[in-house]
């Protein structure tokens, strides 16, 4: 049996120190959000994961610079809508530090960059190449490609919205196969997601979010569970995941996403002309 895995924050840098440059009067919203992420990192670092987990990647750690760049650039004010993914993919956020972070979109549309370090443990079949990764993440290309077409400029999307993952960790089997949180042993899965749920509550309250859109069924379910009973109430809805493993998504995810956003009344928020607010 493989030894249980923990993931250190890493001796190569100290991301917390990067937050020690406060604004003259008070910390920014982005700094507060990053501090919450570092708090979550510290809590998750105490967990151990037995088989089937072989290696754990935490891109909020080793891809700290582009991740901080993303948050600092696009989380400057309150957000009405949070699009919530589940956890990083091996060719998206695991490479770039950005949720659904397909390399070309991150570099060419979001304009996010920065050095990506080598994880403390790196699986030979899943090397971390940062923005030099030659493989495109289909989910991320679909997700951000849709909003690029709809919004035109990133500033239009991020005026009211933000994108975040519930869990910052990527789990790999000894073979290098991606393991979703749903595939973890029940006890470890619940420990992990309970901590992430609590962090989500704090993050939603910090940003002033009124609507969480879970991208995929599991993200939606966890958000409903985590945010039940919050005051003021936070609405939770779902959006089909753009995964290539989804037959429904492969039939036309962009059309399905547009229809769903229309149902939720979000399209006006995502265009230059729109000034409506979600109900």
UniProtKB/Swiss-Prot annotation:
It comes from Mus musculus. Keywords: DNA damage, DNA repair, DNA-binding, Hydrolase, Nucleus. One of its GO terms (molecular function) is single-stranded DNA binding. Gene3D superfamilies: Uracil-DNA glycosylase-like domain. The keyword Kinase does not apply. The keyword Secreted does not apply. It comes from the Eukaryota. It is found in: Nucleus. Belongs to the uracil-DNA glycosylase (UDG) superfamily. SMUG1 family. Substrate binds at residues 86, 100, 165, 241. This is Single-strand selective monofunctional uracil DNA glycosylase. One of its GO terms (cellular component) is nucleolus. Residues 175-189 are annotated as: DNA-binding. It holds the Pfam family UDG. Its EC number is 3.2.2.-. One of its GO terms (biological process) is base-excision repair. Recognizes base lesions in the genome and initiates base excision DNA repair. Acts as a monofunctional DNA glycosylase specific for uracil (U) residues in DNA with a preference for single-stranded DNA substrates. The activity is greater toward mismatches (U/G) compared to matches (U/A). Excises uracil (U), 5-formyluracil (fU) and uracil derivatives bearing an oxidized group at C5 [5-hydroxyuracil (hoU) and 5-hydroxymethyluracil (hmU)] in ssDNA and dsDNA, but not analogous cytosine derivatives (5-hydroxycytosine and 5-formylcytosine), nor other oxidized bases.
């Amino acid at each position: 049996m493989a030894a249980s895995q923990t993931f250190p924050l890493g001796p190569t840098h100290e991301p917390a120190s990067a937050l020690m440059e406060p604004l003259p009067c008070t910390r920014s919203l982005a700094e507060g959000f990053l501090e919450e992420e570092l708090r979550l990192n510290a809590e998750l670092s105490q967990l151990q994961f037995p088989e089937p987990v072989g290696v754990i990647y935490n891109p909020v750690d080793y891809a700290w610079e582009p991740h901080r760049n993303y948050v600092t650039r696009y989380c400057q004010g309150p957000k009405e809508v949070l699009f919530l993914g589940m956890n990083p993919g091996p060719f998206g956020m695991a490479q770039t530090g950005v949720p659904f972070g397909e390399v070309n979109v991150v570099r060419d549309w979001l304009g996010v960059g920065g050095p990506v370090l080598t994880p403390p443990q790196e699986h030979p079949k899943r090397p971390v190449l940062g923005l030099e990764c030659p493989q495109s993440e289909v989910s991320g290309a679909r997700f951000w490609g849709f909003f690029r077409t709809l919004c035109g400029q990133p500033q239009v999307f991020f005026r009211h919205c933000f994108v975040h993952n519930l869990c910052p960790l990527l789990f790999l089997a000894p073979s290098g196969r991606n393991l979703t949180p749903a595939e973890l042993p029940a006890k470890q899965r619940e420990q992990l997601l309970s901590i992430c749920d609590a962090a989500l509550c704090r993050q939603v309250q910090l940003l002033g979010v009124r609507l969480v859109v879970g991208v995929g069924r599991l993200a939606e379910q966890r958000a409903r569970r985590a945010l039940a009973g919050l005051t003021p109430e936070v609405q939770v809805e779902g959006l089909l995941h753009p995964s290539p493993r989804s037959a429904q998504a492969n039939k036309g995810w962009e059309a399905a996403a547009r229809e769903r956003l229309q149902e939720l009344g979000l399209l006006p928020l995502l265009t230059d002309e729109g000034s409506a607010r979600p109900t």
